[in-house]
Amino acid sequence: MHGVNDPPLFIKDIKAGLKNLNVVFIVLEIGRVTKTKDGHEVRSCKVADRTGSITISVWDEIGGLIQTGDIIRLTRGYASMWKGCLTLYTGRGGELQKIGEFCMVYSEVPNFSEPNPDYRGQQNRVVQNEQKDKMNTSIFGTVGNGVQTGPESRGYPLQYGRSNGPGPISPQLPGEPSNQTVRTTISNARDPRRAFKR
């Protein structure tokens, strides 16, 4: 966390979740206005300092006052991920103060608001793990006291999933000979009926 009197933070040091940020930047581009459901105007502006660039989201009338080339000091801002991109916001009690025009050393690269594949990968892994957890949770399994329920609890191994051949998957009862032949299918996961035609 940074206080109001702390020296400005460089854009390269901004991370999602940081609050009370003080940043000095030059406005490079002003995006088109979008309106929220409740009537607020939002502009996304590309801003930069000497360490790189980032997108700042500016709300309502203040967004209409900002112009390309303005040098601005943001106080009490915060950073967050929006649609996989690091974005800067003014926050509650945050201020944007114009302190100059045009004369500032800056670099457009790296753009820290570019979609972050590492972040997207982390989000995808989280979603996949949640889906896996939901799939593993079924009406069978262990009860809170550790007792196994379902067909497995009676000593019958039950196969879940798809079979490799026609017909249903049926449990093999203990002591019975297997009447199913095991077929191994190798697939590249493409449906041959949907082959690309040139």
From Swiss-Prot:
Main location: nucleus
Keyword DNA damage: yes
Composition-biased stretches (Polar residues): 142-151, 177-188
Subcellular location field: Nucleus
GO terms of molecular function: DNA binding; RNA binding; single-stranded DNA binding
Region Disordered: start-end pairs: 142-198
Binding region for DNA: 26-89
A GO CC annotation given for this chain: chromosome, telomeric region
Family affiliation: Belongs to the SOSS-B family. SOSS-B2 subfamily.
Function: Component of the SOSS complex, a multiprotein complex that functions downstream of the MRN complex to promote DNA repair and G2/M checkpoint. In the SOSS complex, acts as a sensor of single-stranded DNA that binds to single-stranded DNA, in particular to polypyrimidines. The SOSS complex associates with DNA lesions and influences diverse endpoints in the cellular DNA damage response including cell-cycle checkpoint activation, recombinational repair and maintenance of genomic stability.
Name of the protein: SOSS complex subunit B2
